[in-house]
């Protein structure tokens, strides 16, 4: 009879949005960054990675403008003193400053920043 068909709940398939939201892409700069800290003979050596949830274009831009972005990272680090980067809060502040500097430069070069996270894969203060 007609009532039998409705025993099975109807499956509704939702279209996946064309933008891959929440897919995070990462890029790690191949070489360390080493620079003096402000007002000190101490220097900081870091390895830096970045992340974005935008499309691959952001990572491609980071890669193709690596030289300009390295300069931005070194400039940002050299504005910090030893006291300012000690502890997790200091590292977070430094990461945010680097992110801002990278995005400003990418906006100049490509019209769009898109770097959402900056990570230190190594962090050595000497």
Where are these regions (language model features)?
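Flexible, low-complexity charged segments
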Residues: 1-126
């Amino acid at each position: 009879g007609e009532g039998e068909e409705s025993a099975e709940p109807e499956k509704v398939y939702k279209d996946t949005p064309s933008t891959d939201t929440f897919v995070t892409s990462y890029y790690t700069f191949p070489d360390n960054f080493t620079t003096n800290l402000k007002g000190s003979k101490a220097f900081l050596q870091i390895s830096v990675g970045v992340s974005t949830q935008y499309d691959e274009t952001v990572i491609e831009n980071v890669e193709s403008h690596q030289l300009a972005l390295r300069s931005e990272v070194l400039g940002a680090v050299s504005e910090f003193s030893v006291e300012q980067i000690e502890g997790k809060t200091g590292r977070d502040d430094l990461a945010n400053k680097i992110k801002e500097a990278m995005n400003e430069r990418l906006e100049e070069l490509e019209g769009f920043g898109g770097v959402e996270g900056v990570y230190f894969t190594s962090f050595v203060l000497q």
